[in-house]
Amino acid sequence: MCGFGLVTSRFTFSYKMIYTVHTFQKLPISLQQAWDFMGDPKNLSVITPDSMGFNTLSGDDRKMFAGQIIIYTITPLFGLKLQWVTEITHVQDKHFFVDEQRFGPYAFWHHKHFLKEIPGGVEMEDIVHYKVPMGILGRLVHPFLVKPKLDEIFAYRKKKLVELFGEFKTERV
């Protein structure tokens, strides 16, 4: 691989200005329960902070399927209301799905959601590749506005999922 990489926390910066968020979470539920929850677009509002002003406009009336278009509004910063159009591009039942932004606040957004059965529950893995808009200005505000907002969103989601399903307990030997 050519280029350079600077890693801070769970975000990666590359010479092409594509950033990466990579998170893991274990929950004490079955793979089927996790899939049923994560595969229902209505639940996105449940695991999104209220401060984001998340509101689904269309596309959440069915379980997730490849080709599904979901349209919603968000208010991520400074009270600015934005429309976000997402397409579910890939689905493998009880294993993974991919959502990609078609129109919205990012220059690029590709989010892979993986589910894996583990002893005592399920492990969820998220890999998001994204690019901020507005060229150099976007890159300058990324560490002060975009990255902290994404940190907040994923931390809220993790906390909310624990509230809903309980904390995963690791057995000590």
Regions found by a protein language model. Give the residues of each.
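Beta-strand/loop substructures that line and gate deep hydrophobic ligand-binding cavities in soluble
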Residues: 101-152, 172
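Glycine-rich portal/gate segments that line the openings of hydrophobic small-molecule binding cavities
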Residues: 56-103, 156-159, 163-164, 168-172
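Hydrophobic ligand-binding cavity/cleft-lining segments
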Residues: 13-65
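A short, structured loop/turn motif at beta-sheet edges
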Residues: 31, 89-96, 114-123
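Beta-strand elements of well-folded, non-transmembrane domains
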Residues: 27-29, 76-78, 90, 105, ...
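Short, surface-exposed coil-to-beta transition loops
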Residues: 20-22, 81-85, 108-111
